[in-house]
Structure formats: C-alpha cells, structure tokens
Amino acid sequence: MKHFRIILASALAIAATNATAIDVNTTGSAQWVCGGAGEQERIQLKGLESEATTELMFVSGKRGGYLADVDFVVRDHKGGTELQGRAGGPKCLLTVPAGRYRVDASHEGAKRSANFQVTRAPGNPTRTVLTFPGDPSETIAPLAQEKAGVKVK
C-alpha cells in the first residue's frame, strides 16, 4: 500500500505537468485511479498497474469500444460502499483489501453489475470487464485490446 501511495503521488506530479489530468482518489483503505482516454493517461495507468489489485474496464457493443464517463460503485461482500466515482476513461485501477466485491456501473441509462474477488497481491490485478450496449463508433476508439488480453462479453 505504501508503494501505491508513492506511485500515486508520482502520477499526480506527472498529471500536473501535462494537459491530461488523472484523478487519484482515496476512501478508507481503498485507492483508485481512472482514465485511459488519451495516450498520456494510458501511459500513466500502465505505470500504476504494478501496484493495483483490481482493474475495471468499461466497453461498449460487440466490438468493445472503450467508454468514458461511467458512474460506478464498488461494494464489499456485506453491501457496504468501498468506493464510488465516475470513470473519466475506460480503465480504473483499484487497490482494495482481499475479499469479495460487487461493482455496479451505469452509462447513459444502461446499468451493468459484476462480482469479483481480490485474492492477489498488488501487481497482478484481477480484471473485470463491464460491457454496455451501444455503437462502438460513438465511443473512444478501440485500442489493441487483443494485446491487453481484454475479453469482451
């Protein structure tokens, strides 16, 4: 967790010097950062993956176009809110304690939910992809998802 804070501080410093700002959030023991809509954000997120326990991806349609402006809430297995926010890009990296969680997300009136479990240490995040209906041509252009190993439902 200490390393994640150092890396988050570095991301904030980088973001402050670039036109693209990346939002870093902390609630209790949970930390998260969302973005990836532009190349600078993708680079910053890539640098943070080694400290994350969970990765959320928000995509649209059968071809998996990336989405931004997705509202989400992550709840623990007892239903308590662990964190909530609005993803400014298609990818969110979370650092949450080991356990079972549920993510509820909404985009333009469509709602999606998924359960996930965190059992891994930071550096090998559990990936959860939420697919929303829509035309991928109206979303952020797909970016070599096959290389990233993203499987679209």
Would you name each region that the model predicts?
Residues G85-R86, N115:
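Short hydrophobic alpha-helix segments
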Residues T20-V74, H107-K153:
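Primarily secretory-pathway and cell-envelope proteins
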